[in-house]
């Protein structure tokens, strides 16, 4: 069986009602934060974890490179993860920052003069490399993720 903190394994809170969508009594005590942390509240909040995952799943569905593309690690900095996913049709750059502060990093070995189109980013503007450059400097938000399509 599973061991650890049983308080972390409480029934899913579908609504702010302790019984959720059921008339039955839950088999375990519900979470203490049920009034604010439930599926109904998450559906209303565009910044919720629900919408974050929905966005990522939609990206994966619409960009096959995320699921079947070749994986190429890019060496950047400590507490960051950077890699490309590529198919014959598409190349994506994925950047993750595990730092609690924003972090500037240099991404190298990109196609000469490439343009990075934001698919998931805090900046909606494309980033362009110099016409003769294969490198770009990007500042990642604290504990953030950015996904770009490389053109």
Residue ranges with predicted function:
Residues 117-135:
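Solvent-exposed beta-strand/loop surfaces of large extracellular or lumenal domains
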Residues 1-104:
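Loop/helix patches that line or flank the sugar-binding groove of alpha-linked glycan CAZymes
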Residues 90-91, 124-127, 146:
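Short, surface-exposed beta-strand/loop "edge" segments at domain boundaries and coil↔beta transitions
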Residues 14-17, 121, 150:
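Active-site donor-binding loop signature of nucleotide-sugar glycosyltransferases
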Residues 130-151:
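C-terminal beta-strand-rich structural cap/linker in extracellular carbohydrate-active enzymes
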